């Protein structure tokens, strides 16, 4: 357990240091390339050296289909009530006048970037590489919506939210913890990062579009 703790947090801490140094000394263009590269390359390198399989990607059409189905169902469950709650939040907390439909391209245009440059690298590292290590340290003890979960699931979500603040501090970064729980759940539900990658990208693109409806 001690070895896993040192390895998981040591690798993550080193990764964040490298990303922070890149932010300080590289241009935004190169920094934008560094982040997904490290998030993909470091776990790939470690797993290759340890001769461990990359078992969190789809290995069959059936598994891919399951991931796509779980993603679609999760969107239908999560986003309608979230959108309704967020709408009233914008009206009564931020005191915007009303909802004014923004162009739908604001949602679709960033989707390829969100999938390939944001969601895939982040889910590859945090849900594919880190979360299984956390689950070995803290064995899943709870059964939630058909999935065995534990403190490893929660710790991974906390580290994910904290990592965003290390790179760029924002007051609302604490809220990243909550969708991270969904990402982690989807990974455990399907055994693959397909559903969390798609849900992650959809969430980011959706929020970019949603807030524009009030500005």
Predicted regions mapped to residue ranges:
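Juxtamembrane helix-loop-helix connectors linking adjacent transmembrane helices
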Residues: 25-29, 54-121, 136-143
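Non-cytosolic membrane-interface motifs at loop->transmembrane helix junctions
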Residues: 27-35, 96-103, 171-181
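Transmembrane helix-loop-helix hairpins at the membrane interface
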Residues: 107-215
């Amino acid at each position: 357990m001690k070895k896993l703790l040192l390895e998981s947090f040591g690798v993550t801490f080193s990764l964040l240091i490298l990303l922070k140094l890149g932010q300080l000394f590289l241009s935004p263009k190169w920094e934008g390339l560094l982040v997904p590269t490290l998030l993909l390359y470091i776990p790939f390198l470690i797993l290759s050296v340890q001769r461990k399989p990359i078992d969190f990607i789809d290995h069959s059409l059936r598994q891919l289909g399951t991931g796509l189905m779980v993603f679609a169902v999760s969107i239908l469950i999560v986003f309608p009530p979230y959108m309704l709650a967020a709408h009233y939040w914008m009206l009564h907390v931020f005191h915007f006048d009303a909802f004014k439909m923004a162009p739908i391209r604001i949602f679709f245009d960033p989707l390829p970037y969100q999938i390939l440059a944001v969601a895939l690298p982040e889910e590859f590292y945090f849900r594919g590489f880190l979360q299984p290590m956390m689950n070995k340290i803290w064995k899943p003890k709870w059964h939630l919506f058909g999935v065995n979960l534990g403190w490893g699931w929660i710790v991974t979500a906390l580290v994910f939210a904290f990592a965003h603040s290390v790179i760029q501090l924002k007051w609302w970064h604490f809220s990243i913890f909550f969708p991270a729980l969904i990402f982690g759940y989807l990974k455990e539900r399907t055994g693959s990062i397909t559903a969390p990658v798609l849900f992650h990208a959809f969430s980011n693109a959706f929020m970019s579009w949603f807030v524009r409806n009030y500005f």
